[in-house]
C-alpha cells in the first residue's frame, strides 16, 4: 500500500496504541504512514486541535485510505476515513464507517492462574473500586432529569459534533462527566437493593481517582480478586476498562448497557452479565438470579474461558482482523466506484 495508507492514532497517558497498530500493520505486511498523536486531556481539547486532526484525516490522494483511532477519547469526526473506537453508541453506529475494538491492555499484570482460580462455587459477592463521580455537577444534574431525557442523552448524539464539544471544553463547561450518572445510579441501586440480603456481600469503594501508585494498584487487585461479580458501569466514556480487568482476573463483569456497542470478538452472553440501563431497579436480583442458576462447575468453566479469552486478545489477532478488513472493504469500495465511472452508458 505504501503511502496509500495513513493511520492516525491518539495515545493515552497509560497506553501506547500507536505501537500496537504498527505491530499489527507489520504482521499484515501493510506499509503505512502512522501518525502518532500525543494524549490530549479532554479538558485541553480546543477547536484548533479538532481542525488539526481533521486535516490529518483528509486523504492526500484519491486512492489513499485513512484510518483514525482517537484512543479512549470519544472523538467522532465525519469524513472519508474509517474510525476505530473502544467506545461507540448503538443509536448511530455505522459499521461501514467505524469499528469497535476490545481493550485488553491494562496497567495491572496478569496474575498466576493458581492464585485466582476457583475450586468451588464462590460467594455471592459484588464489588467496585474506583471513581464514582457522585460529586460532579453534571452527574448530579443528570440524576435529576426525567428518564426519557436520560435515555436520549445516553445515545451520545451531541458527541457527533467534535467542534461543538471542543468549544464546550474551551469555554470551561465541565462536560467530561456529563454521561457518568449511570455509574452513581447503578452503584447506589445495588447497595440499596442488597442491603437486607445477609448472604449478598456488596463492597463499593470510591477512590476519587486512580493514582497508579503501587499501593493503589495492589489494593485494586485485592478488591478485584475478592469479588465474584465486578460492577462495570460506564464512566466518562461508553465502555469500561474494568470489564477487561474483570476477565483478566477471572471474575464476572456486570455491564450496565447504556446504548453500548460491544466488540464482536467476545462471547458476552457466556462470560458477562449484561443489564440494561432501564433494568437498574432489579440489578441485585439480576446478579442473584445469575448466581443461583450457575453451579460450581459452570463458575469454574466460565472463569477458565475468561482467562483464555484474555490470552487470545493479548495476541492482537483482533486488530489484525480489523485493519485487514478495513483495507479490503475500502479497496473494494474504491474499485466499485472506479468500475461505475468506466462502465459505458447503454443507449
Q: What residue ranges belong to the model's regions?
A:
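Short, hinge-like loop/turn segments at secondary-structure boundaries
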Residues: 250, 271-274
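Short alpha-helical segment that forms part of, or immediately flanks, the ligand-binding pocket
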Residues: 221, 244-248
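"Short basic amphipathic alpha-helical interaction patches in structured regions
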Residues: 141-143, 244-245, 275, 288
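Short hydrophobic beta-strand element within catalytic cores of glycosyltransferases
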Residues: 252-256
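Conserved donor-binding/catalytic loop of nucleotide-activated donor transferases
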Residues: 226-227, 247-251
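C-terminal "capping" alpha-helix adjacent to the active site of nucleotide-linked donor transferases
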Residues: 273-297
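Short C-terminal alpha-helical element
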Residues: 296-310
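Nucleotide-sugar donor-binding catalytic core of glycosyltransferases
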Residues: 2-239, 257-270, 299, 312-321, ...
Amino acid at each position: 500500500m505504501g503511502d496509500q495508507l495513513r493511520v492516525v492514532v491518539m495515545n493515552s497517558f497509560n497506553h501506547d496504541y500507536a505501537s500496537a497498530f504498527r505491530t499489527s500493520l507489520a504482521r499484515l505486511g501493510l506499509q503505512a504512514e502512522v501518525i502518532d498523536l500525543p494524549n490530549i486531556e479532554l479538558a485541553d481539547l480546543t477547536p484548533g486541535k479538532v481542525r488539526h486532526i481533521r486535516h490529518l484525516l483528509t486523504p492526500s490522494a484519491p486512492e489513499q485510505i485513512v484510518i483514525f483511532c482517537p484512543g479512549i477519547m470519544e472523538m467522532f469526526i465525519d469524513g472519508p476515513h474509517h474510525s476505530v473506537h473502544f467506545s461507540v453508541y448503538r443509536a448511530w453506529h455505522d459499521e461501514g464507517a467505524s469499528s469497535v475494538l476490545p481493550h485488553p491492555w491494562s496497567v495491572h499484570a496478569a496474575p498466576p492462574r493458581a492464585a485466582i482460580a476457583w475450586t468451588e462455587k464462590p460467594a455471592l459477592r459484588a464489588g467496585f473500586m474506583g471513581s464514582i463521580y457522585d460529586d460532579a455537577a453534571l452527574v448530579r444534574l443528570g440524576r435529576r432529569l426525567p428518564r426519557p431525557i436520560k435515555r436520549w442523552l445516553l445515545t451520545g448524539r451531541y458527541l457527533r459534533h467534535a467542534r461543538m464539544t471542543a468549544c464546550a471544553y474551551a469555554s470551561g463547561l465541565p462536560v467530561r462527566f456529563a454521561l457518568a450518572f449511570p455509574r452513581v445510579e447503578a452503584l447506589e441501586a445495588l447497595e440499596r437493593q442488597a442491603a437486607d440480603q445477609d448472604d449478598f456481600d456488596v463492597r463499593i469503594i470510591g477512590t476519587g481517582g486512580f493514582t497508579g501508585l503501587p499501593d493503589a494498584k495492589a489494593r485494586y487487585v485485592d478488591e478485584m480478586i475478592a469479588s465474584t461479580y465486578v460492577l462495570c458501569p460506564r464512566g466518562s466514556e461508553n465502555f469500561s476498562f474494568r470489564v477487561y480487568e474483570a476477565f483478566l482476573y477471572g471474575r464476572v463483569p456486570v455491564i450496565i448497557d447504556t446504548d453500548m456497542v460491544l466488540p464482536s470478538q467476545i462471547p458476552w452472553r457466556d462470560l458477562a452479565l449484561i443489564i440494561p440501563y432501564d433494568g437498574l431497579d432489579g440489578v441485585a436480583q439480576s446478579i442473584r438470579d445469575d448466581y443461583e442458576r450457575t453451579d460450581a462447575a459452570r463458575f469454574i468453566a466460565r472463569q477458565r474461558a475468561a482467562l483464555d479469552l484474555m490470552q487470545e486478545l493479548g495476541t492482537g489477532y483482533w486488530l489484525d482482523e480489523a485493519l485487514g478488513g478495513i483495507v479490503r472493504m475500502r479497496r473494494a469500495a474504491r474499485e466499485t466506484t472506479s468500475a461505475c465511472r468506466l462502465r459505458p452508458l447503454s443507449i
